[in-house]
């Protein structure tokens, strides 16, 4: 049996770790991805199942591996300026991690090569994934199963597009001052809300708004000054 995972972002790597860790060794599993497609460099926040999957699948130990992954501990979520602001912790003894998305492939893929003889990596930009009935073709190469984790599709023609998305625009801002809080930050603001993800050397901020209410120029004038202000208020 042959399985392919297309894409080496968080979804693709999470998927292939789970497949390799749970499926028998006779199942050959390929990771197909392009080094010319880069992740969004803002950092990513996870729930408690993600460090557990890394631990089971690639022997991740936060105490020893956090620097290589640029990761920090996450004990929950903190809300500010919402109707019911406050800290919502994970269950006792549980934690997630916040990590550098650019470092995740560099950390995971070498360990997959070392730990799983049925793992292969193919570097290429996939042009076509096509169902053949009982098999699937990836640019002419046949697999029994293919999991497409490439992210945003190029063609939305077979999607149902809703007009009920209240926050339809966003920008990300990287602060080179690392956050010293152990949670993901969620701040309501006059145009929508924003998140803050503390990493070891930087902090990633995402600023979200509704384009029908707020212009792009108006929205872009706020995040930098807003993040500097909020970064000093995190422990209030």
Pin down the residues of each PLM region:
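A structural signal for isolated positions on well-ordered beta-strands in alpha/beta enzyme cores
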Residues: 4, 28-30, 206
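Glycine-rich FAD pyrophosphate-binding loop
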Residues: 21-41
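N-terminal Rossmann-like FAD-binding beta1-loop-alpha1 element of flavoenzymes
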Residues: 3-24
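N-terminal FAD cofactor-binding segment of flavoenzymes
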Residues: 39-88
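Single conserved hydrophobic/aromatic residue that forms the stacking wall/gate
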Residues: 228-236
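Short beta-strand to alpha-helix junction loop
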Residues: 92-110
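Predominantly flavin-linked oxidoreductase catalytic cores and closely associated redox partners
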Residues: 115-219
């Amino acid at each position: 049996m042959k399985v392919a995972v297309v894409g080496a972002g968080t979804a693709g790597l999470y998927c292939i770790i789970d497949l390799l860790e749970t499926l028998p060794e006779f199942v050959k599993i390929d990771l197909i991805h392009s080094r010319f497609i880069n992740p969004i460099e803002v950092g990513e926040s996870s729930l408690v199942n993600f460090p557990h999957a890394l631990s089971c699948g690639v022997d991740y130990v936060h105490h020893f591996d956090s620097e290589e992954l640029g990761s920090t501990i996450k004990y929950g979520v903190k809300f500010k300026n919402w109707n019911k602001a406050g800290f919502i912790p994970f269950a006792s003894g549980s934690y997630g991690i916040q990590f550098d998305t650019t470092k995740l492939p560099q950390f995971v893929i070498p360990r997959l090569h070392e730990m799983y003889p049925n793992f292969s990596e193919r570097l290429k930009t996939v042009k076509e994934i096509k169902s053949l009935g009982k098999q699937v073709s990836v640019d002419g190469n046949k697999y029994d199963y293919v999991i497409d984790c490439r992210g945003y599709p190029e063609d939305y023609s077979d999607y149902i597009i809703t007009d009920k998305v209240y926050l339809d625009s966003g920008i990300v801002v990287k602060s080179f001052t690392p956050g010293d809080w152990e949670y993901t930050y969620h701040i309501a603001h006059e145009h929508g809300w924003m998140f803050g993800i503390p990493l070891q050397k930087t902090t990633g901020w995402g600023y979200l708004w509704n384009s029908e209410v707020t212009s792009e120029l108006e929205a872009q004038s706020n995040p930098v000054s807003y993040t500097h202000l909020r970064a000093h208020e995190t422990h209030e």
